[in-house]
């Protein structure tokens, strides 16, 4: 992250204020303040991750994934025989915190801040699937988009999507 000395001073002051405003996270803010003030390049890369960016296209794809899971669960609940498909298979897991943290952060933002998909169960891990999911979700989306009635899926269509 490239910053001028003036920008570093401003950010350092912000962290100093946050230390006073949020004592529970004071150590974290003091650490970040030290990194900024001293210009530790390796540790400043952490800020790049914190101040990362998701493109509009990526955000829309994540919403599409969440919408697909909404459709899967609604369709599953409307089946005459729900025993044929385990409910866990149509439950949104989220993304891997280790490799897909930005996607996971966006999911948490959508649910906890925006109030969308609040019926999704965050589980004990807060939508941390603990395994990379992006490619799996892409395959599932391709199958779901090919279905003529995306919100009235048959058991066969549900199985095709979750097994993609």
UniProtKB/Swiss-Prot annotation:
Its domain of life reads Bacteria
Record-stated family: Belongs to the UPF0304 family.
**What Pfam families does the annotation carry?**
YfbU (PF03887)
Query: What gene does the UniProt entry assign to this protein?
Result: yfbU
Checking SUPFAM superfamilies in the record gives: YfbU-like
UniProt-recorded name of the protein: UPF0304 protein YfbU
